Amino acid sequence: MPANTSAAIARSCEFSQYLHRLLTARPEERQRLEQSLHHPFSLEDMQAFADWPALDAPEALAPALRRLRQAVVARLICRDLESLATLDEVVSTISQLAEFAVRQALACAAASLPQYGRPIGEDSGEPQQLIVIGMGKLGGGELNVSSDIDLIFIYPEGGETDGARKISNHEYFTQVGKRLIALLNDATADGQVFRVDMRLRPYGDSGPLVMSFAALENYLLSQGREWERYAWIKAKAITGDADGLAQLVRPFVYRKYLDYNAYGAMRGLHAQIRREVARRDMADNIKLGPGGIREAEFIAQVFQLIRGGRDRTLQLRGTRATLERLAALRLLEPAAVAELQASYAFLRNLEHRLQYLDDQQTQTLPEAPETRQKIAASMGHADWPAFLDALNEVRRKVSRHFEQVFILPSEDSASHPLSELWLDVAEQSPETRLAELGYADPAAVARQLTGLAQSQRYLQMPLAGRKQLDALMPALIEVAARFPNADDTLSRIIGLMEAISRRASYLALLTEYPQTLQRLASLYSSSAWVSAYLSRHPILLDELLDARMLYAAPDWPLLAAQLETQLAQADGDVEAKMDALRHFQHAQTFRLVAQDLAGMWTLEALSDELSRLADLVLAAAVRHAWRDIPSRHCETPRFAVIGYGKLGGKELGYASDLDIIFLYDDEHPDAPDLYSRLARKLSTWLTSATAAGVLYDIDLRLRPNGSSGLLVSSISAFRQYQENQAWVWEHQALTRARFVAGDAGIGSQFEAERHAILTLERDPAKLRDEVMAMRQRMLDSHPAHDGDVKNARGGIIDIEFIVQYLILAHAKTLPALTGNTGNIALLAVAAEAGLIDRRLAEDARAAYRLYRRLQHSARLNDRKTVEVDESLRTAYARGRELWRQVFEQALDFS
């Protein structure tokens, strides 16, 4: 044996009375430790420790498990104290031991009841197995070396056993559970394997020892409490049907919506712990005391409770893994997470050293000077004061981060200077005070406030929700008054409050994060469309929390990867995938509109971003809708989405429809049917109104033969149609078409066909007549008036028709016109080639930009028309002048 190994064991014994006693009493254990100290205790080592299958009697298994535990703990103590093991190794090894022991004990307990036979499910007719659930640190794989283990026993179905002596499955599993507990928990001459705590089961000590899936589901739905959601985060099925358990428990723990009420629930649980700590004078408890282990765990778990239902990557059991995920999602600053990780590791290492002393489950600092010195030295400090300084600094850091996350908002509605105005709005006349605040029509504002305060919606709110709204309203009245259009701003905010009054989680969000109120009011002041959008999708309030994320330019490759992760998590659940697409699209749209209102985008750049968003969403929808098609003959569909109109021309607005068609290129005999099913499914995914709303409205009428044509065409049929049957207006539409999503090979074929069609030689006079006739038909159905920049003479459609005519008439000799670069750029190409007057082209470009800006502004403020002023009239005149040059003068531009 190397001298350094012997010295390491001797040093470890100085810090652990338990290890010293064990090695003195069991020389063979010292020998084993000397031979294996430099190797972790693996699962394979545990399996090889004894001939476990032969130990099928409780009296044989019990001592073997206890000796295994002694060997594992002895090696862990030495490896940890000698810095040979990381914290990960310590907690994962002891957790692995607990799971191994549970499985061995369960097998032995079941084998000891042969007279009953097998438990058979009354519904399935299949043999049943006890599901042993590890809770707490065992479930999280972060068990303490001297910890007890929290277990819950569940079985899938009722029924009875099939042996000579029949008993109910409930009775059978109760007996199995009792025997399992005894095998692990009973104190013998060899000690215990693990103390077993069953108090986390439904109804606690007063509840049945075992429970069926159905009974557990009923309990969680009808009686499950908030603290139990916290507890079940870490639940892990050590044996049995893990998937069945997860499907049952996940909806209880992780809500579909963002659950900001979790803050209040966790605060309540923390306050209860603090009261218990104070009552029992436990300030020196590094787990439950201020700045202790539990506070670090709460920080991780509150984000899981709030967001885990929406983001399954947060459905983790371990504290440290969860903290890392929070940093990756930027829910906590990476620097804060690094500090929390280091603090948590310090506290867990300290916890282990306290337990190494005498193999006791303790988290309390010692009082004896000699023991204090041992702890200080084992933590790498010269003396107790130096160690205490380090510990106090760690606890201060944890407390600071805890307070930052759980900062207590003011829910005392009487504390705000305007509280009396809101709380007594129906009994007094607040007009004078509202006028002083800056409201233009205080009487109308007072009527709105009174209407809300006297509405059945408000009066029927639960007390907790009404208290939150009462706390919010004075602050909202104050913040809305800071904006020039204060009356409209507050009116829109009141509409939001009415929309979310039954959604306590959203009220909790605004209460927990009062800094969001200014951002909310700013957006509501700027745009009626945004106000309506947010009221329809209040889940987007979450986007207001982090201004850096809200105003960060989109990183589309990163966002695409995040969306793919969310869709993969919902694999097999079509509704969840449809909602994931909607949540993603709504969130990105909301971020873009916030950035737009902040002046971060030109209109052309904004349209590019909205088009990239649509492209990304369509690509993801195609991939995942195809996976939902049964009997498909290939993994990747030979199918493409082609965008027309505003999508094709990259001129999308916030509420634009998507003009699209579907093409395929596949010789398989089932291809027409499969791709028709895909097209129908994709249309459903895009347009169906789910709980999360609608993704996009789509228009499929530009496909070959329009509404009477096939929903999806082969690329060869599309080519034949375009070359032989398409009308001129369909070729006009093709000028703004592009490949958007799906098979890039089909996209290339489409682009080649588009180029071929656009560069056909045409009779300019005949083309002119057909284009002008089409424009007249549009005017007949949508008469021109100057407040409508789209249909007005000299407006958007006229300029678009000019560009389309120039492309179809001259692309054969000027192929640059086939580039899908937008109307403004194509006007410049035409002018450069001498097809149109340069001055008129530049005027038309400026006019087109003006029209789009006015149209965009009108839509943001829910106006159907624009204000007609001299600059707009001048723009129309320039557009009409270009129209006359192109269509009413000689068409020979050579």
From Swiss-Prot:
Region (Adenylyl removase): which ranges? 1-410
Tell me the gene name: glnE
Q: Name one Pfam family in it.
A: GlnE
**One Gene Ontology biological process:** regulation of glutamine family amino acid metabolic process
Query: Which coenzymes or cofactors are required?
Result: Mg(2+)
Q: Which family does it belong to?
A: Belongs to the GlnE family.
Q: Please tell me whether the keyword Oxidoreductase is annotated for this protein.
A: no
Give the species this sequence originates from: Chromobacterium violaceum (strain ATCC 12472 / DSM 30191 / JCM 1249 / CCUG 213 / NBRC 12614 / NCIMB 9131 / NCTC 9757 / MK)
Specify the enzyme's EC class, one word.
transferase
Q: Which cysteines are joined by disulfide bonds?
A: none
Q: Which terms are listed as keywords in the entry? A: ATP-binding, Magnesium, Multifunctional enzyme, Nucleotide-binding, Nucleotidyltransferase, Transferase
Q: What is this protein called?
A: Bifunctional glutamine synthetase adenylyltransferase/adenylyl-removing enzyme
InterPro entries, per this entry? GlnE, GlnE_rpt_dom, NT_sf, PII_UdlTrfase/GS_AdlTrfase
| The protein's role, per its UniProt record | Involved in the regulation of glutamine synthetase GlnA, a key enzyme in the process to assimilate ammonia. When cellular nitrogen levels are high, the C-terminal adenylyl transferase (AT) inactivates GlnA by covalent transfer of an adenylyl group from ATP to specific tyrosine residue of GlnA, thus reducing its activity. Conversely, when nitrogen levels are low, the N-terminal adenylyl removase (AR) activates GlnA by removing the adenylyl group by phosphorolysis, increasing its activity.
Q: Name one GO molecular function term.
A: [glutamine synthetase]-adenylyl-L-tyrosine phosphorylase activity
- Gene3D superfamilies, per this entry? 1.20.120.1510, Beta Polymerase, domain 2, Nucleotidyltransferases domain 2
Its catalytic activity? [glutamine synthetase]-O(4)-(5'-adenylyl)-L-tyrosine + phosphate = [glutamine synthetase]-L-tyrosine + ADP; [glutamine synthetase]-L-tyrosine + ATP = [glutamine synthetase]-O(4)-(5'-adenylyl)-L-tyrosine + diphosphate
User: Listed GO cellular component terms?
Assistant: cytosol
Q: Which domain of life is it from?
A: Bacteria
- Using the UniProt annotation, give all residue ranges assigned to the region (Adenylyl transferase): 415-894
